[in-house]
């Protein structure tokens, strides 16, 4: 799964901009590179929790940085755990343990229960 770009600017209302073509000097068109972001997902969650609340582009950028940071921390810890146990695959068990190690108390419990729920939903939909 490709990792989103680190310095991705947040688009308004959490949507990605379409790839626009930029005119070059010799007449050929060059595609503008896409900036990956968690903005659309942050926006969807915001609307689930507070339907009447908006988010500024600066706040969206901060949320995007936060999600990237947490993703890297969990992935790094899960990688270390797999390495310690001489495993070459990161499973949901490593992710769960990494979350328990990284997040404090009640937050870890909620994250683990939500993660378990998501994995169950995914496997039942297959």
UniProtKB/Swiss-Prot annotation:
Localization per Swiss-Prot or TrEMBL: Nucleus; Secreted; Chromosome
Post-translational modification note: Monoubiquitination of Lys-121 by BRE1 gives a specific tag for epigenetic transcriptional activation and is also prerequisite for histone H3 'Lys-4' and 'Lys-79' methylation.
Signal peptide: none
Modified sites of kind Phosphoserine: 15
Comp. bias regions, Low complexity: 1-12
Keywords noted in UniProt: Acetylation, Amphibian defense peptide, Antibiotic, Antimicrobial, Chromosome, DNA-binding, Glycoprotein, Isopeptide bond, Nucleosome core, Nucleus, Phosphoprotein, Secreted, Ubl conjugation
Glycosylated residues (UniProt): 113
GO terms assigned for molecular function: DNA binding; protein heterodimerization activity; protein-containing complex binding; structural constituent of chromatin
Disulphide-bridged cysteine pairs: none
N6-acetyllysine: modified positions: 6, 13, 16, 21
Region named Disordered: 1-35
Chief location: nucleus
Protein name, entry field: Histone H2B
């Amino acid at each position: 799964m490709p990792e989103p770009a680190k310095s991705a600017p947040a688009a308004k209302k959490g949507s990605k901009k379409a790839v626009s073509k930029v005119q070059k000097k010799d007449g050929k068109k060059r595609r503008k590179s896409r900036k990956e972001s968690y903005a659309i997902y942050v926006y969807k969650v915001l609307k689930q929790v507070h339907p009447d609340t908006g988010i500024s582009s600066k706040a969206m950028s901060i949320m995007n940085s936060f999600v990237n940071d947490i993703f890297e921390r969990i992935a790094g810890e899960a990688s270390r755990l797999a390495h310690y146990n001489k495993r070459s695959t990161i499973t949901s068990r490593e992710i769960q343990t990494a979350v328990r190690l990284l997040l404090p108390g009640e937050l870890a419990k909620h994250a683990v229960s939500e993660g378990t729920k998501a994995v169950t939903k995914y496997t039942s939909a297959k």
